[in-house]
UniProtKB/Swiss-Prot annotation:
ABC transporter domain span: 679-929, 1344-1578
InterPro entries: AAA+_ATPase, ABC1_TM_dom, ABC1_TM_sf, ABC_transporter-like_ATP-bd, ABC_transporter-like_CS, ABC_transporter_C-like, ABCC8, ABCC8/9
Known partners and oligomeric status: Forms an heterooctamer with KCNJ11; four ABCC8/SUR1 molecules interact with one KCNJ11 homotetramer.
Binding site for ADP: T1380, G1381, G1383, K1384, S1385, S1386
Membrane-spanning ranges: 31-47, 73-89, 107-123, 137-153, 170-186, 304-319, 357-372, 439-454, 461-473, 542-557, 577-592, 1013-1030, 1067-1083, 1143-1160, 1162-1174, 1249-1264, 1281-1296
Stated name of the protein: ATP-binding cassette sub-family C member 8
Keyword annotations of the record: ATP-binding, Cell membrane, Diabetes mellitus, Disease variant, Disulfide bond, Glycoprotein, Magnesium, Membrane, Metal-binding, Nucleotide-binding, Receptor, Repeat, Transmembrane, Transmembrane helix, Transport
GO CC aspect terms: inward rectifying potassium channel; membrane; plasma membrane; potassium ion-transporting ATPase complex; presynaptic membrane; sarcolemma; synaptic vesicle membrane
Protein species of origin: Homo sapiens (Human)
Record annotation: effect of changing G1378S: In HHF1; highly decreases cell membrane expression; highly reduced traffic efficiency; dramatically reduced potassium channel response to activators such as MgADP or to diazoxide
Mutation effect (L890P): In HHF1; no effect on cell membrane expression; no effect on traffic efficiency; dramatically reduced potassium channel response to activators such as MgADP or to diazoxide
C-alpha cells in the first residue's frame, strides 16, 4: 500500500500539511530517514568497491594499529546509540500495535538509523586501520544531518506537548544528545589530525610496539569492540589448533607491559613515597602505598567494571519478576491517551510491562553484564601480572646487592628467596585480582537485600539473616582450610626434601641397603601429610557443602516462613523465582568473602616478607662516574673495596675496631713492591655474621700482580674465606682491602655521598675477577654458554681452553656436543666435569685477575697435571695475569711465585718457596714429605705419554679411555645411552593428545568400585533432587496463584491452609534431602581424592625406590622429582576439587537444558546450533588453553631457575661484574612468563565471553519460547519462571564446564605420568639362597675370588669389564688404578651387583654373590664413594641410620676419620644437625663423615672409591695410616685418586679398557721399567 508508511487508514491525516510540512509527524519521520540513506549510499561503495589507492595505505602486519582521537568515546557512544535505537524500534512496534492501522514510520526510520549506526562504526574502523582520515568527511556530514533532523523532531514533540510521560519523547531526546556528541567527536578529530580545513595535515606514526613484528599481544591496540569480545584472539586460537603454541607464536610483550617499564613505574612510586616520608622507611605500609600509586588506577578501572557488572546482574531477577508477573496476570489491552496525528505513543511503564521487551532487555543486560565482568577480570589480572613482574625485578636487583652472610650464615636461604619470588609475588598478583571484590561485594549485598525486601517484604530479612549469619561459619571454615593447607604444605615440603635427598643419594642407599630406612622415613612424613590432607579434605568438603546448601537452606526458611507467618503475603511464581534468583546472587559475594579475606591476609604477610627482604643487609659498593681522571699519587694504584655491610636493623659494630691501628696506617706504601701488587689486605678481621666471631683474624697479605699465588693449608683453615674476603663478600670488622686501580676507561669516580674511604685519597672500584668457586656453579645452559659466560665468542681461545681443561672427550660423548643443555646445577655431568667447566669459564675470560678455589679436588692426577700445565701456567701466568690458586696439591708449589700458608683462620706465613725453606724449615720439610717435587721434564713426558696412549675420541665410554669423563662408569654409560634418546633438555616435546580418558579411568578405578559407585550415584541423585525442589516450587507457586481468587468463595479456609501446608511439607522434605545429598557428594569426592592420592604415592614410592640404578642414570632426576612434587600435589589437592566442579557444572547445565526443554520443547530446535557452536568453541579452546598453560609453566621454570642460580652463584656473578647482564636475562625471563600468562588470561576471557554470550542466547530463546507458549498454550507462569531461572543458570555454568574440562584434561596428565613410572621394572631383590642358609657373620674372612668376570651397564651396551680374574686373600689391601674410563668404578660396583654381570662369578667366602638376596649382599659390605653424600638430620642419623651402634662406636669412627674434635665442638655433639647436602661443612669434612660412616659398619670387606679426592694430602696420609691399622684384619680395596696412596698396598691391579693390565705387588711393578703402574707413580710425584 502506498500510504502504509504513514498509516493505512483511509482518512487524510497523512496528507495534512495545512500547518506546514514540519508539523506533519510522518513527514518529519521521513525526513529523519534521509541522513541514514545518505550514509549507506556513500559508504557502501567505498567499503565494497574499493577506496583509496594501495599506496595511500600504511602496510603493517596488524589490522588495528592506530586510534583516532576520541576512539573509545566514539565506540561507547555508538553502543549507546544502538541500544537507544533498539528501544525506539521496540517502542515503535508496540505503539503501532495499539491500533489496527500499520504506521511504518514509527519504527522504520529507527531501523534505518540502526543500519546506519552499524555502518558508521564499520566504516570508521576501516578508515582508522588504514590511517586515511580524509574519508571521515562522510561521517562528519552524516552526524550533522542526523543531529539536525532529530533536533527538528524533538522540537516538534515539544510543540505538541509530548513530554517525559511518553517513551518516544525520552528516546528522541537521548538521540539528539548522542548525535550531538558524536558530531563533537568528529570535529575533535579534525582539530587534532587537521585532515581538512588546514593546509598541513598532522601525520601520526604507528605505535612503536606495532612496528615491531614480534609483538603479537594486541589487546591494548585493538578497537573497543575487539577488546570487549577478544575478537583479535580468534586468529590466534585458530592457529593454535593447527600447530603447537611456542614462545615464537606469542611473541613479545608491548613496551607498557614489560617488566622493565613496570619496574621503573614501581621505583618512581617508591621514590615518591620516600620523598614524602622524611625518615625514608621501607616498611610494609610504604610498599602498599607505592603499589597503590603505581597500579592503583587500573585497579579502580577494574573495580568500576565489576560494580557495573554486579548491578547489571540484578536485571535477571527483575526481568524474571516482570515476565512471570506479566504472564501470571490477566493484562487488559491498554489504550494510551496521548496522540500525535492519530498515532498513540506508549509510556515507559507500558513499555517495560511487555514480556517480550523484558526478554530482549534481559538478553542485552546479560551481554553487557558478562562483558563488564570479563573486562574487570582481565584488567585486574593484567594489573596483577604487571605488578608481579615489577616486584620480581625489584627482588632480583636487591639480590644483586645482598650481603653474602645473609645467605651463607644469616637470616635467609635460597629457598626462602625463591619462595618470595614464586609464592609471595603470586599471592600479591591474586590479591589484585580479587581486590575489586572488596568494593563490589558490599554493593552487591546491599542492593540484593533491598530488592529481596522489595519483592518479599519482611520475609526477605529471614533469608538474608540466614546467609549473613552463616558467613562467619564460612569464614571459620575458610580459616581452618587455610591452616590445613599450610600444614599440608609444610609436610609436603619436608617430604619433598626427604625424597630429593633419597633420589640424590639413591646410589649410596642401594650400596648400603638402606632403601627401606629411607622409604619408611618418607612414608612417615607422608602419613603426617595425609593427616593434614584429611583435614584439608574435610574442610574443603564442608566448604563445598555450604556453598551448595546455604542457598537451599535460605530459600527453604524464607519461603516456608513467608507462607506460614504472612498468610496474606503474595507468593506468586514471579515473587518466588525472582527471589530464588536473588538468593543465588546474594550468596555469591558471601562465598567469595572467605577467599577474599584469605587472599588479603596472605597478601599482608607477603608484603611483610617483602619489606623484611628489601630492608635486609646489603654490600655497598661505590659507583664511579665514567671517564673521570684518576688522581695521581703514590697510592692511586690501590682501591679499597668497601666491605662494610649496610644493615638497617643493627648498628655498626665498633667493638673490634681496636684490633688494628688507625685507618691511615693501613695505606699501602708507595715503594716498588706496592707497584707490583694487585691485592693487599692489611690488618683485616672478617666474619660471616655481624655479631659473630671473626672467621679470619689479623690478615695481612699481598698478592703480586701478574704472578701465580698459591694458598695452602689444612681443611677448614679459611682458604676459601680469604678469597671471598678479598672479593668483598665477607663482612669486614676492621682493617682494609686494597685493589690496584684500573685504567681510566674502566673505572670512574664515585658520586656517592656515603663514600667509605680508607684514606683521604680517591678510592676506586675493583675490576672483574674471573672466579671459579670450590663448589662448581653452572648455569642451566649449554656447555659452550657456561664456558664463554656472556663474553664474545672467540673460536681459537675457546679451543685452547677446552684443550687445557681436557674437555674435548667429554664434549664428544655428549648428545649434542658443546650445545648440550647440561641441566640445572649441572646435573647431567659428573663432579669432575662440572669442576673443569667452572675452571674453563675462568680461563676463557679476559679478566686480569683469576681466582681458582681448589680446582683439582675432583680431578685425577693426569687431568690435574694437564690443567696446571696447559691452563694455569700457559694460558694464565704466561699471559702475565694475576692468578690466585687455592689447592691441596702441594706438588705444584714449585710453580708458585708467591705462597700464602694459612692455619686456623690466620696467615701462618707468606713468601716464595725459598723463603719458606729458609725461615719455616719445619713446615717446608712437612711439605717436602708430602709432595716429592717433580721436575719439569718428567711432567712433560707424562703428559706426552698420556696423549700417545689416548684412543680415538667420540667413541662410547666402554670403547674409549678418554680423559675427564664421568668419574663413575655407570654415569658414563648413561651419557652414551641418552645420546641415542636425544636427551637434550633444550628441546621441549609437545604432546597434544585428546582428553586422557585412560588416565581418568585409572584415577577413578584407584578409588575402588564401592566409592566410585557411591560417587556417581550421589551426584546424579543430588541434581535430580535439586531439579525436583525447583519443579515443586513452580507447582506450589502456581497453586498459590490459582488459589488467590478462589479463596474469596472458599467456605472452608482450613482446606486452603491444608493445601499450602502439604506443599510446604513436601518442599521441606525435598530441601532437607538436597542438603543431605550435598554433604554426601562433597564428602565422597574428597574421600575419593584422598584414597587415590594415598594409593598412587605409595605405589610410586615403592616402585621408584626398588628401581634398578640404570633407571636413575637414564631418567633425569628432575623428572622423577616432579612426579613426587607437582604431580602428587595435583593429585592431592587439585584433581578432587576440579572433579567436583566439573561434575557439578556439567550436571547443572544438563539438568538446566533438560528443564528448559521440558518447559518449552521447541527450545530443542534452537539448542542444536548452539550446541554445535559450543562444541567447536570448547574444542578450539582446550587445545590453546592446554598449550598456553604448559607454556606458562615452562616459562616460569627458567625464571625461578634463574633466581635460584643467581642466589647460588651470587659471589661468582659479582666477582665477574656481570650483574647487568644477569638483570637483563631476568627481564627476558620475566617478560616471557608474563606474555604467556597474559595470553592464557586472554584465552580464558575469550572462552568465557563466548560461552556467556551463548548462555545469553539460551536465556533469550528460552524466554521468547516460554512467553509464546504461555500466551498461546496456557503454559503456567510457574513453569515459565522455572525455565527462565534455569536458563540463567546455564549462562552462569556453561563456561565453568568448559574451563573445568580443560583443567581436568591438564591435571589428568599427572596421573598419566605417574602411571608411566609405575611400569618401571624393579630390581630382583630375591636370591637363590634362603636367608637361613647364609651365615649371620658372612663374610667373616674377606676372601674374594673373581672368575672370568664380565659386566655391563645394560644388555644393549658393550661390556665395561671383560674376563677379569683375580684372587684376593683375607685381610689383603688391594689398590686399583687406571686412567679415567678404564673400569675402576665398575669393578667396585660389581661387588654390589649394581651392574649387569652377564658372565663369570664373584665368590666371597665361598658364596657366589649372584645367589644372595640383594639386601643381604649389600648390607654385609662397605664402600665409600668419591662424591660425599650427607643427609639432613643429626650426625648420629648420618653415621648410623639403622640405630644399631652405641655412642662409643660412633665416637670411635669419628676419631678414625679425624672428626672427633670437630663434632665435640658442635652444640649437641652426635645430635648436632647436618643441613641438607651437608652444606654447613666443607667438602673435605663431608668426605670424612662418609669415611666414618663406612667405619661404623665394620664389615670384613671395605671398598674406597677415590674416597680422599677432596681431602688435603696431610689428612689423607693420616687417614691411610689409620685405615691400615684399624682395618688390619679386613680386606680393603682402594681405587686410587692419588697413586702414592696405594704404594703400601699388598697387591695392585692396573686396569685398562675393562681388562686387567697388571696385577702384582707394587714393589715388583715399580721395579719393571715398562710397568704402567710405575709410570703412574712417576707422574704422581
Amino acid at each position: 500500500m502506498p500510504l502504509a508508511f504513514c498509516g493505512s487508514e483511509n482518512h487524510s491525516a497523512a496528507y495534512r500539511v495545512d500547518q506546514g510540512v514540519l508539523n506533519n509527524g510522518c513527514f518529519v519521520d521521513a525526513l529523519n530517514v534521509v541522513p541514514h540513506v545518505f550514509l549507506l549510499f556513500i559508504t557502501f561503495p567505498i567499503l565494497f568497491i574499493g577506496w583509496g589507492s594501495q599506496s595511500s595505505k600504511v602496510h603493517i602486519h596488524h589490522s588495528t594499529w592506530l586510534h583516532f582521537p576520541g576512539h573509545n568515546l566514539r565506540w561507547i557512544l555508538t553502543f549507546m546509540l544502538l541500544f537507544v535505537l533498539v528501544c525506539e524500534i521496540a517502542e515503535g512496534i508496540l505503539s503501532d500495535g495499539v491500533t489496527e492501522s500499520h504506521h511504518l514510520h514509527l519504527y522504520m526510520p529507527a531501523g534505518m538509523a540502526f543500519m546506519a549506526a552499524v555502518t558508521s562504526v564499520v566504516y570508521y574502523h576501516n578508515i582508522e586501520t588504514s590511517n586515511f582520515p580524509k574519508l571521515l568527511i562522510a561521517l562528519l556530514v552524516y552526524w550533522t544531518l542526523a543531529f539536525i533532523t532529530k533536533t527538528i523532531k524533538f522540537v516538534k514533540f515539544l510543540d505538541h506537548a509530548i513530554g517525559f510521560s511518553q517513551l518516544r519523547f525520552c528516546l528522541t531526546g537521548l538521540l539528539v544528545i548522542l548525535y550531538g556528541m558524536l558530531l563533537l567527536v568528529e570535529v575533535n578529530v579534525i582539530r587534532v589530525r587537521r585532515y581538512i580545513f588546514f593546509k598541513t595535515p598532522r601525520e601520526v606514526k604507528p605505535p612503536e610496539d606495532l612496528q615491531d613484528l614480534g609483538v603479537r599481544f594486541l589487546q591494548p591496540f585493538v578497537n573497543l569492540l575487539s577488546k570487549g569480545t577478544y575478537w583479535w584472539m580468534n586468529a590466534f586460537i585458530k592457529t593454535a589448533h593447527k600447530k603447537p603454541i611456542d614462545l615464537r607464536a606469542i611473541g613479545k610483550l608491548p613496551i607498557a607491559m614489560r617488566a622493565l617499564t613496570n619496574y621503573q613505574r614501581l621505583c618512581e612510586a617508591f621514590d615518591a613515597q620516600v620523598r614524602k616520608d622524611i625518615q625514608g622507611t621501607q616498611g610494609a605500609r610504604a610498599i602498599w602505598q607505592a603499589l597503590s600509586h603505581a597500579f592503583g588506577r587500573r585497579l579502580v578501572l577494574s573495580s568500576t567494571f565489576r560494580i557495573l557488572a554486579d548491578l547489571l546482574g540484578f536485571a535477571g531477577p527483575l526481568c524474571i519478576f516482570g515476565i512471570v508477573d506479566h504472564l501470571g496476570k490477566e493484562n487488559d489491552v491498554f489504550q494510551p491517551k496521548t496522540q500525535f496525528l492519530g498515532v498513540y505513543f506508549v509510556s515507559s511503564q507500558e513499555f517495560l510491562a511487555n514480556a517480550y521487551v523484558l526478554a530482549v532487555l534481559l538478553f542485552l543486560a546479560l551481554l553487557l553484564q558478562r562483558t563488564f565482568l570479563q573486562a574487570s577480570y582481565y584488567v585486574a589480572i593484567e594489573t596483577g601480572i604487571n605488578l608481579r613482574g615489577a616486584i620480581q625485578t625489584k627482588i632480583y636487583n636487591k639480590i644483586m646487592h645482598l650481603s653474602t652472610s645473609n645467605l651463607s650464615m644469616g637470616e635467609m636461604t635460597a629457598g626462602q628467596i625463591c619462595n618470595l619470588v614464586a609464592i609471595d609475588t603470586n599471592q600479591l598478583m591474586w590479591f589484585f585480582f580479587l581486590c575489586p571484590n572488596l568494593w563490589a561485594m558490599p554493593v552487591q549485598i546491599i542492593v540484593g537485600v533491598i530488592l529481596l525486601y522489595y519483592i518479599l517484604g519482611v520475609s526477605a530479612l529471614i533469608g538474608a539473616a540466614v546467609i549473613i549469619l552463616l558467613a562467619p561459619v564460612q569464614y571459620f571454615v575458610a580459616t581452618k582450610l587455610s591452616q590445613a593447607q599450610r600444614s599440608t604444605l609444610e609436610y609436603s615440603n619436608e617430604r619433598l626434601k626427604q625424597t630429593n635427598e633419597m633420589l640424590r643419594g639413591i646410589k649410596l642407599l642401594k650400596l648400603y641397603a638402606w632403601e627401606n630406612i629411607f622409604r619408611t622415613r618418607v612414608e612417615t612424613t607422608r602419613r603426617k601429610e595425609m593427616t593434614s590432607l584429611r583435614a584439608f579434605a574435610i574442610y574443603t568438603s564442608i566448604s563445598i557443602f555450604m556453598n551448595t546448601a546455604i542457598p537451599i537452606a535460605a530459600v527453604l526458611i524464607t519461603f516456608v516462613g513467608h507462607v506460614s507467618f504472612f498468610k496474606e503475603a503474595d507468593f506468586s511464581p514471579s515473587v518466588a523465582f525472582a527471589s530464588l534468583s536473588l538468593f543465588h546472587i546474594l550468596v555469591t559475594p558471601l562465598f567469595l568473602l572467605s577467599s577474599v579475606v584469605r587472599s588479603t591476609v596472605k597478601a599482608l604477610v607477603s608484603v611483610q616478607k617483602l619489606s623484611e627482604f628489601l630492608s635486609s643487609a646489603e654490600i655497598r659498593e661505590e659507583q664511579c662516574a665514567p671517564h673521570e681522571p684518576t688522581p695521581q699519587g703514590p697510592a692511586s694504584k690501590y682501591q679499597a673495596v668497601p666491605l662494610r655491610v649496610v644493615n638497617r636493623k643493627r648498628p655498626a659494630r665498633e667493638d673490634c675496631r681496636g684490633l688494628t691501628g688507625p685507618l691511615q696506617s693501613l695505606v699501602p706504601s708507595a715503594d716498588g713492591d706496592a707497584d707490583n701488587c694487585c691485592v693487599q689486605i692489611m690488618g683485616g678481621y672478617f666474619t660471616w655474621t655481624p655479631d659473630g666471631i671473626p672467621t679470619l683474624s689479623n690478615i695481612t697479605i699481598r698478592i703480586p700482580r701478574g704472578q701465580l699465588t698459591m694458598i695452602v693449608g689444612q681443611v677448614g683453615c679459611g682458604k676459601s674465606s680469604l678469597l671471598l674476603a678479598a672479593l668483598g663478600e665477607m663482612q669486614k670488622v676492621s682493617g682494609a682491602v686494597f685493589w690496584s686501580s684500573l685504567p681510566d676507561s674502566e673505572i670512574g669516580e664515585d658520586p656517592s655521598p656515603e663514600r667509605e674511604t680508607a684514606t683521604d685519597l680517591d678510592i676506586r672500584k675493583r675490576g672483574p675477577v674471573a672466579y671459579a668457586s670450590q663448589k662448581p656453579w653452572l648455569l642451566n645452559a649449554t656447555v659452550e654458554e657456561n664456558i664463554i659466560f656472556e663474553s664474545p665468542f672467540n673460536k681459537q681461545r675457546y679451543k685452547m681452553v677446552i684443550e687445557a681443561c681436557s674437555l674435548q672427550p667429554d664434549i664428544d660423548i655428549l648428545p649434542h656436543g658443546d650445545q648440550t643443555q647440561i641441566g640445572e646445577r649441572g646435573i647431567n655431568l659428573s663432579g669432575g666435569q662440572r669442576q673443569r667447566i667452572s675452571v674453563a669459564r675462568a680461563l676463557y675470560q679476559h679478566a686480569n685477575v683469576v681466582f681458582l678455589d681448589d680446582p683439582f679436588s675432583a680431578l685425577d692426577i693426569h687431568l690435574s697435571d694437564h690443567l696446571m700445565q696447559a691452563g694455569i701456567l700457559e694460558l694464565l701466568r704466561d699471559d702475565k695475569r694475576t692468578v690466585v690458586l687455592v689447592t691441596h696439591k702441594l706438588q705444584y708449589l714449585p710453580h708458585a711465585d708467591w705462597i700464602i700458608a694459612m692455619k686456623d683462620g690466620t696467615i701462618q706465613r707468606e713468601g716464595t718457596l725459598k723463603d719458606f725453606q729458609r725461615s719455616e724449615c719445619q713446615l717446608f720439610e712437612h711439605w717436602k714429605t708430602l709432595m716429592n717435587r717433580q721436575d719439569q721434564e718428567l711432567e712433560k713426558e707424562t703428559v706426552t705419554e698420556r696423549k700417545a696412549t689416548e684412543p680415538p675420541q667420540g667413541l662410547s665410554r666402554a670403547m674409549s679411555s678418554r680423559d675427564g669423563l664421568l668419574q663413575d662408569e655407570e654415569e658414563e654409560e648413561e651419557e652414551a645411552a641418552e645420546s641415542e634418546e636425544d636427551d637434550n633438555l633444550s628441546s621441549m616435546l609437545h604432546q597434544r593428545a585428546e582428553i586422557p580418558w585412560r588416565a581418568c579411568a585409572k584415577y577413578l578405578s584407584s578409588a575402588g568400585i564401592l566409592l566410585l559407585s557411591l560417587l556417581v550415584f550421589s551426584q546424579l541423585l543430588k541434581h535430580m533432587v535439586l531439579v525436583a525442589i525447583d519443579y515443586w516450587l513452580a507447582k506450589w507457586t502456581d497453586s498459590a496463584l490459582t488459589l488467590t481468587p478462589a479463596a474469596r468463595n472458599c467456605s472452608l479456609s482450613q482446606e486452603c491452609t491444608l493445601d499450602q501446608t502439604v506443599y510446604a511439607m513436601v518442599f521441606t522434605v525435598l530441601c532437607s534431602l538436597g542438603i543431605v545429598l550435598c554433604l554426601v557428594t562433597s564428602v565422597t569426592v574428597e574421600w575419593t581424592g584422598l584414597k587415590v592420592a594415598k594409593r598412587l604415592h605409595r605405589s610410586l614410592l615403592n616402585r621408584i625406590i626398588l628401581a634398578p640404578m640404570r633407571f636413575f642414570e637414564t631418567t633425569p632426576l628432575g623428572s622423577i622429582l616432579n612426579r613426587f612434587s607437582s604431580d602428587c600435589n595435583t593429585i592431592d589437592q587439585h584433581i578432587p576439587s576440579t572433579l567436583e566442579c566439573l561434575s557439578r557444572s556439567t550436571l547443572l547445565c544438563v539438568s538446566a537444558l533438560a528443564v528448559i526443554s521440558y518447559v518449552t520443547p521447541v527450545f530443542l530446535v534452537a539448542l542444536l546450533p548452539l550446541a554445535i557452536v559450543c562444541y567447536f568453541i570448547q574444542k578450539y579452546f582446550r587445545v590453546a588453553s592446554r598449550d598456553l598453560q604448559q607454556l606458562d609453566d615452562t616459562t616460569q621454570l627458567p625464571l625461578l631457575s634463574h633466581f635460584a642460580e643467581t642466589v647460588e652463584g651470587l659471589t661468582t656473578i659479582r666477582a665477574f661484574r656481570y650483574e647487568a647482564r644477569f638483570q637483563q636475562k631476568l627481564l627476558e625471563y620475566t617478560d616471557s612468563n608474563n606474555i604467556a600468562s597474559l595470553f592464557l588470561t586472554a584465552a580464558n576471557r575469550w572462552l568465557e565471553v563466548r560461552m556467556e554470550y551463548i548462555g545469553a542466547c539460551v536465556v533469550l530463546i528460552a524466554a521468547v519460547t516460554s512467553i509464546s507458549n504461555s500466551l498461546h498454550r496456557e503454559l503456567s507462569a510457574g513453569l515459565v519462571g522455572l525455565g527462565l531461572t534455569y536458563a540463567l543458570m546455564v549462562s552462569n555454568y556453561l563456561n565453568w564446564m568448559v574451563r573445568n574440562l580443560a583443567d581436568m584434561e591438564l591435571q589428568l596428565g599427572a596421573v598419566k605420568r605417574i602411571h608411566g613410572l609405575l611400569k618401571t621394572e624393579a630390581e630382583s631383590y630375591e636370591g637363590l639362597l634362603a636367608p637361613s642358609l647364609i651365615p649371620k657373620n658372612w663374610p667373616d674372612q674377606g676372601k674374594i675370588q673373581i672368575q672370568n668376570l664380565s659386566v655391563r651397564y645394560d644388555s644393549s651396551l658393550k661390556p665395561v669389564l671383560k674376563h677379569v680374574n683375580a684372587l684376593i686373600a683375607p685381610g689383603q689391601k688391594i689398590g686399583i688404578c687406571g686412567r679415567t674410563g678404564s673400569g675402576k668404578s665398575s669393578f667396585s660396583l660389581a661387588f654390589f651387583r649394581m651392574v649387569d654381570t652377564f658372565e663369570g662369578h664373584i665368590i666371597i667366602d665361598g658364596i657366589d654373590i649372584a645367589k644372595l638376596p640383594l639386601h643381604t649382599l649389600r648390607s654385609r659390605l662397605s664402600i665409600i664413594l668419591q662424591d660425599p653424600v650427607l643427609f639432613s638430620g643429626t650426625i648420629r642419623f648420618n653415621l648410623d641410620p639403622e640405630r644399631k651402634c652405641s655412642d662409643s662406636t660412633l665416637w670411635e669412627a669419628l676419631e678414625i676419620a679425624q672428626l672427633k674434635l670437630v663434632v665435640k665442638a658442635l652444640p649437641g655433639g652426635l645430635d648436632a644437625i647436618i643441613t641438607e647436602g651437608g652444606e654447613n661443612f666443607s667438602q673435605g669434612q663431608r668426605q670424612l663423615f662418609c669415611l666414618a660412616r663406612a667405619f661404623v659398619r665394620k664389615t670384613s670387606i671395605f671398598i674406597m672409591d677415590e674416597a680422599t679426592a677432596s681431602i688435603d694430602m696431610a689428612t689423607e696420609n693420616i687417614l691411610q695410616k689409620v685405615v691400615m691399622t684399624a682395618f688390619a684384619d679386613r680386606t680393603v680395596v682402594t681405587i686410587a685418586h692419588r697413586v702414592h696412596t696405594i704404594l703400601s698396598a699388598d697387591l695392585v691391579i692396573v686396569l685398562k679398557r675393562g681388562a686387567i693390565l697388571e696385577f702384582d705387588k707394587p714393589e715388583k711393578l715399580l721395579s719393571r721399567k715398562d710397568s704402567v703402574f710405575a709410570s703412574f707413580v712417576r707422574a704422581d710425584k
